Amino acid sequence: MPFWKRKSKELGTPAHGPDFSDVDTREKALALVEKGQLEPLYLMPPEFGGAEDPRNIVYVPIGIADIKRSTDLNVIAPLVESGDLQNYSAVPEYRGRSFIPMAIKIEASDPKRFECEINIWGEALDRETELQRPDSG
């Protein structure tokens, strides 16, 4: 789902994991950054030409930015340097009116393709559990 489209339906409390449903403004997110609960994450990293711009920054629980940065620098950057990838996007997926993304989908392509999703909270964590279940067939 593109970042400018948010699910309008109120979803209630997530089944498990953290709940950022009430963090519905940038100001509330920045207050949690000040408390040490959230950190900024660059969608397009500075190493790839990403700007220091509020539209390029989302706020996530501590540690998530390191996971994305590691993926960008240790997986994608070498593939870009070898000519295997030329296009890059990192798209946040939101839950309800929350300002905190519940997942970030990273895609890089041309001529090869790389995709991954960083699941952060809410239903995105359920998707992660579904992927880990053994095939029951």
Region roles according to the model:
Residues 19-137:
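Domain-level detector of nuclease and nuclease-like folds
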